[in-house]
């Protein structure tokens, strides 16, 4: 296990050093590499060395990708194991590029574009909806399968789900309610399984980009350590076997997202999700956020303030990509609700977060 996560230790060093550009690149690479685990794939040492050079600013992301392509062209890959590593390396480099971009459009076309960009050079069908029905045996279901959408209803189903989500307002929801709704939406998109392969990695990148529109910097650690859990949680959110008392549930996915957004420490164990797991005390060590009554926007503000108590409203607006007017309104509300206070005056004072986040 230690050998598998050497890459994580190496990339963590850039975050510990505290340089913003290096930290951001390292976090993207950690998510990109960790996500390969959803399909049991591992990246190569060559990919890690290339990632380090990119993080250190010696090469840009385009050069990093070209190096990966050239590396495998020279090796003339034929063996299945090496083909899997090649896929992991290429897709990881594409994910790192996408996560660094400050662009996003909430639409089925964006989901399709993400798949195309992740898997160009890997699958001939990159960016194309599947043209046949599928089933997949799942470990967490004892070899049974989720029922995926019929291929001829993919586009209509995606259009419907996206239109419903686009019209939905999170404004009056607290964090717990927001997470439950996000889990339901994301698991629904995954259940459609619009592509032949690569659906989970595509869904993960889409979800990260979507969550960033709420002002969140998504935890790289949660995806780096728990990508397979993420997949199994999506499976359990879409599987029913009423005859045997098994119901579809988003509870596991909600725990994952809560850890991702709030720094909560739910114990994310795959065995807890297995349909034959019977122990009742699944997570005695869970630590729960005390800011469940905040909105997602308020939580994003509190997290930025906790990292930098001297942050200005202008800097807050830039950090979570909201207007200064919105920040001013929200900080006043947070102070009135007892979540935040200002010490030592407006000009030279500091913020103090009064709740655990």
Give the location of each predicted region.
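FIC/Doc superfamily catalytic core
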Residues: 1-357
């Amino acid at each position: 296990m230690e050998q598998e996560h050497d890459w994580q230790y190496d990339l963590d060093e850039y975050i510990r050093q505290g340089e913003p550009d290096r930290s951001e690149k390292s976090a993207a690479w950690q998510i990109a590499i960790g996500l390969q685990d959803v399909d049991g794939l591992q990246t190569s040492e060559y990919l890690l060395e290339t990632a380090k050079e990119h993080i250190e600013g010696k090469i840009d992301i385009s050069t990093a990708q070209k190096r990966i392509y050239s590396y495998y062209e020279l090796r003339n890959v034929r063996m299945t194991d090496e083909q899997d590593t090649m896929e992991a390396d290429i897709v990881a480099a594409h994910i790192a590029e996408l996560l660094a971009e400050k662009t996003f459009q909430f639409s089925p076309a964006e989901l399709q574009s993400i798949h195309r960009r992740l898997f160009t050079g890997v699958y001939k069908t990159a960016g194309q909806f599947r043209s046949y029905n599928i089933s997949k045996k799942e470990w967490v279901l004892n070899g049974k399968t989720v029922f995926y959408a019929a291929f001829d209803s993919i586009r209509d189903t995606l259009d419907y789900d996206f239109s419903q989500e686009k019209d939905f307002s999170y404004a009056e929801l607290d964090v717990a309610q927001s997470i439950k709704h996000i889990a339901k939406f994301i698991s629904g998109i995954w259940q459609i399984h619009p592509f032949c392969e690569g659906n989970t990695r595509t869904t993960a990148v889409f979800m990260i980009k979507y969550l960033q529109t709420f002002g969140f910097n998504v935890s790289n650690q949660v995806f780096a350590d728990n990508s397979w859990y993420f997949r199994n949680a999506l499976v359990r959110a879409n599987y029913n076997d009423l005859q045997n008392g098994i119901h579809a549930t988003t509870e596991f996915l909600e725990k994952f997202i809560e850890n991702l957004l709030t720094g909560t420490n739910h114990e994310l164990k795959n065995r807890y999700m297995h349909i034959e797991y019977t122990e009742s005390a699944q997570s005695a060590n869970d630590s729960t956020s005390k800011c469940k009554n905040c909105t997602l926007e308020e939580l994003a503000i509190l997290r930025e303030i906790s990292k930098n108590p001297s942050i200005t409203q202008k800097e807050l607006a830039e950090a979570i990509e909201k207007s200064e007017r919105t920040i001013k309104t929200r900080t006043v509300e947070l102070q009135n609700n007892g979540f935040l206070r200002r010490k030592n005056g407006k000009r030279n004072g500091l913020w103090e977060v009064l709740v655990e986040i």
